[in-house]
């Protein structure tokens, strides 16, 4: 086993790249053992353009299967190996946004039995034995029910993994550090200010339209300048969901709202102790202070 092991738990294909793609690529390039666990296939995603319109839930309902290929390509670009899905690909369905018909589907991730999915993630933790786990904050970044569910379940699983609970899920393993992936408000604003000409049809976000957290909440910053090409390639691999601008400095989802490709990714430590910090009191390494 590698001396540094990292597990990131995300709700849908593309989430891993949008918020943590640079971090995945950096640690993979540095020789860490990086695992990405995805909870659904993203069947309810809105596609870009007409090329994939026949795949969506209201048509052939084959988008989820197609997105397995996108995720496989994206993770390859990031150097993170093949995808891993919670209890297997397609076991849980994308819930869509709150109040939609898709959220009532019995297979929707939000309707999963909490103990069963907690046990499943405990089993992954005990198998991978990560020093560091990354998932979403309590709001799921932007409020998607599957992100919020992932936050709840991963938090419970990290707490349980080092105990005698779920004895059938493997040998207990204590996770040293748990982080939430977030976007720092000032970094987002600076990135937006650097955006120049936009592709036709794109627009800049209104103030507060993109999710971010106050700068003071951020405990850890990962410099991803050296792996931005890998992140851009991974974003482009999610072609049903993401368009990278010709400039290579911003991207948009199906809503055509421009978002900067930031040179740093931001995290909040919520379990474990902060390691070495800079003059601003922030870590620059997820594994800082971890005894391997």
UniProtKB/Swiss-Prot annotation:
Q: Name one GO molecular function term.
A: zinc ion binding
Q: Quote the catalytic activity from the record.
A: 1D-myo-inositol 2-acetamido-2-deoxy-alpha-D-glucopyranoside + H2O = 1D-myo-inositol 2-amino-2-deoxy-alpha-D-glucopyranoside + acetate
Enzymatic class: hydrolase
* Ligand binding (Zn(2+)): 12, 15, 147
Write out the entry's keywords from A to Z. Answer: Hydrolase, Metal-binding, Zinc
Give the note describing cofactor binding and stoichiometry: Binds 1 zinc ion per subunit.
Cofactor dependency: Zn(2+)
Q: Name one Pfam family in it.
A: PIG-L
UniProt keyword annotation of Hydrolase present: yes
Q: Which domain of life is it from?
A: Bacteria
* Enzyme Commission number(s) from the entry: 3.5.1.103
Q: Which InterPro entries match?
A: GlcNAc_PI_deacetylase-related, LmbE-like_dom_sf, Mycothiol_biosynthesis_MshB
A GO biological process of this protein is: mycothiol biosynthetic process
Q: What does this protein do?
A: Catalyzes the deacetylation of 1D-myo-inositol 2-acetamido-2-deoxy-alpha-D-glucopyranoside (GlcNAc-Ins) in the mycothiol biosynthesis pathway.
Q: Which family does it belong to?
A: Belongs to the MshB deacetylase family.
Protein name, as recorded: 1D-myo-inositol 2-acetamido-2-deoxy-alpha-D-glucopyranoside deacetylase
Query: Taxonomically, what lineage is the organism?
Result: Bacteria, Bacillati, Actinomycetota, Actinomycetes, Mycobacteriales
Which gene underlies this protein?
mshB
């Amino acid at each position: 086993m590698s001396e540094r092991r990292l597990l990131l738990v995300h709700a849908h294909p593309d989430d891993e790249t949008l918020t943590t793609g640079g971090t995945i690529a950096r640690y993979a390039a540095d020789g860490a053992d990086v695992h990405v666990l995805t909870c659904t296939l993203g069947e309810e995603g809105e596609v870009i353009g007409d090329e994939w319109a026949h795949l969506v839930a209201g048509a052939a309902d084959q988008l989820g299967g197609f997105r397995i290929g996108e995720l496989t390509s994206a993770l390859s670009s990031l150097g993170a190996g093949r995808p891993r899905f919670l209890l297997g690909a397609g076991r849980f369905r994308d819930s869509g946004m709150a109040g939609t018909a898709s959220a009532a589907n019995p297979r929707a991730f939000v309707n999963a039995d909490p103990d069963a999915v907690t046990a499943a993630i405990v089993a992954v933790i005990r198998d991978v034995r990560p020093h560091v786990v990354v998932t979403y904050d309590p709001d799921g970044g932007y409020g998607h029910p599957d992100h919020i569910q992932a936050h709840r379940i991963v938090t419970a699983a990290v707490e349980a993994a080092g105990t005698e609970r779920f004895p059938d899920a493997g040998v207990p393993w204590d996770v040293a550090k748990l982080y939430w992936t977030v976007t720092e408000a000032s970094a987002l604003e600076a990135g937006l200010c650097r955006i120049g000409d936009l592709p036709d049809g794109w627009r800049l976000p209104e103030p507060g339209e993109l999710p971010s957290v106050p700068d003071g909440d951020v405990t850890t910053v990962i410099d991803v300048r050296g792996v931005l090409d890998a992140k851009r390639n991974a974003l482009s691999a999610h072609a049903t969901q993401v368009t990278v601008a010709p400039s290579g400095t911003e991207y948009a989802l199906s809503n055509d709202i421009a978002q900067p490709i930031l040179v740093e990714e931001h995290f909040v430590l919520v379990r474990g102790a902060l390691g070495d910090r800079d003059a601003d009191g922030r870590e620059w390494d997820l594994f800082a202070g971890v005894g391997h």
